Curated annotation (Swiss-Prot):
Binding sites annotated in the UniProt record for Zn(2+): H540, H544, D618
Pfam families: AAA, AAA_lid_3, Peptidase_M41, Yme1-like_N
Stated name of the protein: Mitochondrial inner membrane i-AAA protease supercomplex subunit YME1
Keywords: ATP-binding, Hydrolase, Membrane, Metal-binding, Metalloprotease, Mitochondrion, Mitochondrion inner membrane, Nucleotide-binding, Protease, Zinc
Biased composition (Basic and acidic residues): 51-64, 728-740
Any one GO molecular-function label of the UniProt entry: ATP binding
Positions contributing to ATP binding: G321, P322, P323, G324, T325, G326, K327, T328
Cofactor binding, per record: Binds 1 zinc ion per subunit.
Effect of Y354S: Does not complement a YME1 deletion mutant, retains 20% protease activity in vitro, binds an unfolded hybrid substrate protein
Main location: mitochondrion
Localization (cell): Mitochondrion inner membrane
Length: 747
């Protein structure tokens, strides 16, 4: 047989691998091993031919230990020489060797044809050992891709002993003993593992030829079908879709439950009625509003009473009025009297930077109220979300109001839920919100009158220790225009001031101090004043006081002081004797004259060039009053009975010029009246100014005495530090040359 016929070319190997892809590991490994051993067989036969022809190969070199060196590579095997036969008969030796060579070639071909048969390999190993070629046994056994068995391992161990690799032979023997002991326990398992893995499974350094190695990898070309490609894309798209959905849902969950957006959820805004002890008896000064809300309480307590007669209570109640009049207190009292849950929110709590949060909070609030009906929903500062809509506004800006309108329409009239809103600007609310069917009942909570103020003062005075001289009625008459909150603050300020003075009770002087602080501002006792500035302030306030005292139709004088309060160096305060709901033209002119009194007094004393900027606030107030007379009250002869205040820009320039000129004329006329009166009352002006310099603060009765030149039973006082002004102040020496008023005597 020609050895070259069994050589396997790379092209043939590649084609076979492509055709037999399912059996790629076994077929590929067998072909590679057959190719390698075909090359070795060709050289082996050449060696035997040279030996038979009488040409001996060179002798092997021995190492220093005397043992023959053996290499597992093909080159070392080709150059090696088998040891001489041990028989002495040369002819017999030559015959046996020749026979052995022929048999070796035959057995090698059989072993190469069936590399997966351990029996064929064992027979070839035995023949090699008989021919004294142990190095070929070792080289072939260690070649990947050749089958092995315990018998082959024993022959391999014997070959290792012959070539002097005793340590490796001992390792093989130890592995055989281990395999035999495992076979005693489970023979089927041991035989199965031996047949499948062979010797190479017992040595980690050796690899399995069926799966290739890093040194000799298997090159594979796989042709995928259309179904495989489509299925792979579907798999990746499915995985990508699942991951995308999971990520989006996770992000949504995180954003909805983190601190940043957790506030978008409406918390439980209900108030435990057991902890709300506010009743209608605690609400004073607004009897009419309380009577309106008593109907709501009756409905919440017994709704069947109204259902039987077909009556329907309003779905919403709107409380309007100035700040501090008790709108929130009325809503709490309504819930306390009815004994139902009370939900409250401010109008500004609905909207945030995120779009849609306001509408969601409206829905959640009403859902909570429905689940705990009967209940009351109170929305304070309703104008924050219920303002008039503008077609130019963005859609998201109207979502909260639209949702509120829907919730109000969705209410059942017998559901036991009442919504109460409160606002200081009812004119700013959207008309759709206040129409019948929504906030269809409007309750005006106005400022208390004198009787209401007295009731409020009595209610708050129950909590403090009062002196016998305290009369709430007198305080009520002296505090017109004060709201319930301001009256409560007045009582508290008086009690605190009495404690600071170590008083055993709160008397009228403490209430007067608290009233002055609220009406005129806090005293600025630490302010440093020049003598000229203090004197100018005294004449300025004296001018106001003289005009208020001697002008027909002016509001009665309350107090005048040159003690700095708030932002003013001095103040002249007027209080009406009764609550006023309207004003006449004569009273408006009197207001103008009183405002002009301070400026004219400074002009009369110091000249026009030395008037101060303290007149600015007076002129602002006078201009506002004069403009209202012309544009709102119809008190102008030139303009006539026309209201110009609304849509001022829509009026013609001529009408507006006439109105402006009329305002200026009213102010000039008032200035002339004030100049005539102060010139006439010049003595009283100087007396009152001197009295203010000496006593700082004078009430209406004391002002009357000072103007008449009477002696005051009062200590002189100067709260602020007074220093000498600079020489550049032209007012410094003005008035010093005039004689002192002889009636102003030291107390």
């Amino acid at each position: 047989m020609n050895v070259s016929k069994i050589l396997v070319s790379p092209t043939v190997t590649t084609n076979v691998l492509r055709i037999f892809a399912p059996r790629l590991p076994q077929i590929g490994a067998s072909l590679l091993v057959q190719k390698k051993w075909a090359l070795r067989s060709k050289k082996f036969y050449r060696f035997y031919s040279e030996k038979n022809s009488g040409e001996m190969p060179p002798k092997k070199e021995a190492d220093s230990s005397g043992k023959a060196s053996n290499k597992s590579t093909i080159s070392s095997i080709d150059n090696s020489q088998p040891p001489p036969p041990s028989n002495t008969n040369d002819k017999t030796k030559q015959a046996n060797v020749a026979v052995s060579h022929a048999m070796l070639a035959t057995r090698e071909q059989e072993a190469n044809k069936d590399l997966t048969s351990p029996d064929a390999q064992a027979a070839f190993y035995k023949l090699l050992l008989q021919s004294n070629y142990p190095q070929y046994v070792v080289s072939r056994f260690e070649t990947p891709g050749i089958a092995s068995s315990p018998e082959c391992m024993e022959l391999y161990m014997e070959a290792l002993q012959r070539i002097g690799r005793h340590s490796e032979a001992d390792a093989v023997r130890q592995n055989l003993l281990t395999a035999s002991s495992a076979g005693a326990v489970n023979p089927s398992l041991a035989s199965s593992s031996s047949n499948q893995s062979g010797y190479h499974g017992n040595f980690p350094s050796m690899y399995s030829p069926l799966y290739g190695s890093r040194k000799e990898p298997l090159h594979v070309v796989v042709s995928e079908s259309t179904f495989t490609v489509v299925s792979r894309w579907v798999k990746w798209l499915l995985v990508f879709g699942i991951l995308t959905y999971s990520f989006s849902e996770g992000f949504k969950y995180i954003t909805e439950n983190t601190t940043l957006l957790k506030s978008s959820e409406v918390a439980d805004k209900s108030v435990d009625v057991a902890k709300t002890n506010v009743k209608f008896d605690d609400v004073c000064g607004c009897d009419e509003a309380r009577a309106e809300l008593e109907e709501i309480v009756d409905f919440l307590k017994d709704p069947t009473k109204y259902e039987s007669l077909g009556g329907k209570l309003p779905k919403g109640v709107l409380l309007t009025g100035p700040p501090g009049t008790g709108k929130t207190l009325l809503a709490r009292a309504t819930a306390g009297e009815a004994g139902v849950d009370f939900f409250f929110m401010s109008g500004s709590e609905f909207d945030e930077v995120y779009v849609g949060v306001g509408a969601k909070r409206i829905r959640d609030l009403f859902a909570q109220a429905r689940s705990r009906a009967p209940a009351i929903i109170f929305i304070d500062e309703l104008d924050a979300i219920g303002g008039k809509r503008n077609p130019k506004d963005q859609a998201y800006a109207k979502q909260t109001l639209n949702q509120l309108l829907v919730e109000l329409d969705g209410f059942s009239q017998t559901s036991g839920i009442i919504i109460i809103g409160a606002t200081n600007f009812p004119e700013a609310l959207d008309k759709a919100l206040t129409r019948p069917g929504r906030f269809d009942k409007v309750v005006n909570v106005d400022l208390p009158d004198v009787r209401g103020r007295a009731d409020i003062l009595k209610h708050h005075m129950k909590k403090i220790t009062l002196a016998d001289n305290v009369d709430p009625t007198i305080i009520a008459r002296g505090t017109p225009g004060l709201s319930g909150a301001e009256l409560a603050n007045l009582v508290n300020q008086a009690a605190v001031y009495a404690c600071q003075k170590n008083a055993v009770s709160v008397d009228m002087s403490h209430f007067e101090w608290a009233k002055d602080k609220i009406l005129m501002g806090a005293e600025r006792k630490t302010m440093v004043l020049t003598d000229a500035a203090r004197k100018a302030t005294a004449f300025h306030e004296a001018g106001h006081a003289i005009m208020a005292k001697y002008t027909n139709g002016a509001t009665p004088l309350y107090k005048a002081t040159i003690l700095p309060r708030g932002r003013a160096l001095g103040i002249t305060f007027q209080l009406p004797e009764m609550d006023k709901v309207d004003i006449t033209k004569r009273e408006c002119q009197a207001r103008l004259d009183v405002c002009m009194g301070g400026k004219i007094a400074e002009e009369l004393i110091y000249g026009k060039d030395n008037t101060t900027s303290g007149c600015g606030s007076d002129l602002q107030s006078a201009t506002g009053t004069a403009r209202a007379m012309v544009t709102q009250y119809g008190m102008s002869d030139d303009v006539g009975p026309v209201n110009l205040s609304e849509n001022w820009e829509s009026w013609s320039n001529k009408i507006r010029d006439i109105a402006d000129n009329e305002v200026i004329e009213l102010l000039k006329d008032s200035e002339e009246r004030a100049r005539r009166l102060l010139t006439k009352k010049n003595v009283e002006l100087h007396r009152l100014a001197q009295g203010l310099i000496e006593y700082e603060t004078l009430d209406a009765h004391e002002i009357e005495q000072v103007c008449k030149g009477e002696k005051l039973d009062k200590l002189k006082t100067s709260t602020n530090t007074v220093v000498e002004g600079p020489d550049s102040d032209e007012r410094k020496d003005i008035g010093d040359d005039k004689p002192k008023i002889p009636t102003m005597l030291n107390a």
